[in-house]
Structure formats: C-alpha cells, structure tokens
Amino acid sequence: MAIVKCKPTSPGRRHVVKIVNQDLYKGKPFAALLDKKDKSGGRNNNGRITTRHIGGGHKQHYRIVDFKRDKDGIPAKVERLEYDPNRTANIALVLYADGERRYILAPKGLKAGDAIASGADAAIKVGNTLPMRNIPVGSTVHAVEMKPGKGAQLARSAGTFIQILAREGNYVTLRLRSGEVRKVLAECRATIGEVGNSEHMLRQLGKAGANRWRGIRPTVRGMAMNPVDHPHGGGEGRNKGMQPVSPWGQKAKGFKTRKNKRTDKYIVRRRNK
C-alpha cells in the first residue's frame, strides 16, 4: 500500500493524493458474481428528484459480496484481492473446497493464498467468521450481524472495526467506531480483524470532476438560492434570519430524528457527537 501525491502538472492534478495497492488483481472481476447496476439519477418512477446531488458517473457492475458467511465447515482459500467501485473496502475472491467461489470483504492483513473458514468451530484468526458467543471478549471484529442469519450490517467500511466489550447471557456488548455501545445477540456472526484499506481516508480527489465520475453532483448552499427555492434564500446580505433548516423546513441542527424506540433498550450509550 502506497500513498502517491501527484505532481502539479495541471490544476486538476495539483491536489490529487492516490492510494496505490500493488496487491490488487489487475484483471477483470469474476463474471458469475457480477450483477447489473442501474442508475436512477436520484429520481423515482414518476421522474421526480427524490434524492438530490445524484447523477452521471462511470458505468459500474455490482459485486455480489457474501455477508452471511454461512458455508460452515468447508475450508476456503483466498485466490486474489480486488477493487470494488461500490464500497470503500477492497474485496477478496475465495475458493471453497467444494468448488464454489464467493466474494468477501478483505480484512487487514489478508492476502492471496491464505486459508479462511467459518462456523462455530473456526479458529480465532483474521478472516474467519464465528458466532460472537465463541469469540473472546476484547477481540476486534468487523462485518457484524444485527440479527442472526441476516448478514453483516455493522463495520463494513474501509478501516472500521468493532470491539467486543462483554458477554452476558444471550447478548454481547459491542463498542462501535462512532463511540456507541450497544447489545447484540451472541448468536450473531462477526469476522475476526478489521476491514482493510484503512488508508482510504487519506486520499484526495483533487478536483470537482472526480466526484462527477463517482456520480455525485454539486451541492448548492441554501443561502445562495432564491426564497422560492429554499427557506434560507433571499434577503439582504448574508444572513439566514432563522434557525438552520432543510429545504423542506425540518430543523438541521439538534433536531432528534431517531424514531425506532423499539430498539432503544439495546443501546447502552449513545454515540459521540
């Protein structure tokens, strides 16, 4: 893994910082694990914009990643590491002993040729997936399920991890990267180690066009709009004249948006703000 700062041969290259990983496979992805990825431009079936700042971008295929890791007792070998345009983490193509291939999230330290396994009897080793009741307290994990069998939902981005703080009864207590401490059923699965490609946060796109390649359109400030377009628009000078709100009038700062009271009992400590 190398961090490359581009030479200022043009204004668009002056601030570019790239992450170069020589271990990534340079060929095409495994075709059987690809799916089409349609673009909506942020519009619904009526053609109206429902999500702003979306449109354009390079054509991509979706990589079908195995978040359940449910092939218990069947050893697998890592064939190669690959780039995935749909997520910040890299992915690994693994070959199981029965001949099946699957993509998984590539943990930090995993490389081609490594052996991995899943199931209650799997060893405590980077890349192995186990129910959290079988993982020692204090371990660092990623790709954590919130419901048994549903598949990983937590700690899937580049460089993220979760620490197991305690195990009590049918639940384990986890500390998330946000600082939140919450309880999850001990039968939920997690993968040992942290997600790789942690240097992703150090990259710099360098120009607005790089965001357009990613399908992200410009964001205009509400204060720069007219009154018809945004509550912050218009007026003399640079003054909102009101509490910051969204284009539809919902308070933007300090307004509680969490609605799921049913799961409040599982949150031991709210995230750091």
Swiss-Prot record:
Pfam families given in the database record: Ribosomal_L2, Ribosomal_L2_C
GO cellular component: large ribosomal subunit
Biased composition (Basic and acidic residues): 229-239
Ribosomal protein is among the record's keywords: yes
Sorted UniProt keywords: Ribonucleoprotein, Ribosomal protein, RNA-binding, rRNA-binding
Regions of compositional bias (Basic residues) in chain numbering: 253-273
Any one biological process term the GO annotation gives: cytoplasmic translation
Superkingdom classification of source: Bacteria
Gene Ontology terms, MF aspect: rRNA binding; structural constituent of ribosome; transferase activity
Function statement: One of the primary rRNA binding proteins. Required for association of the 30S and 50S subunits to form the 70S ribosome, for tRNA binding and peptide bond formation. It has been suggested to have peptidyltransferase activity; this is somewhat controversial. Makes several contacts with the 16S rRNA in the 70S ribosome.
Cross-referenced PANTHER family: LARGE RIBOSOMAL SUBUNIT PROTEIN UL2M, RIBOSOMAL PROTEIN L2
Quaternary state and interactors: Part of the 50S ribosomal subunit. Forms a bridge to the 30S subunit in the 70S ribosome.
Entry's family note: Belongs to the universal ribosomal protein uL2 family.
Name under which the protein is recorded: Large ribosomal subunit protein uL2
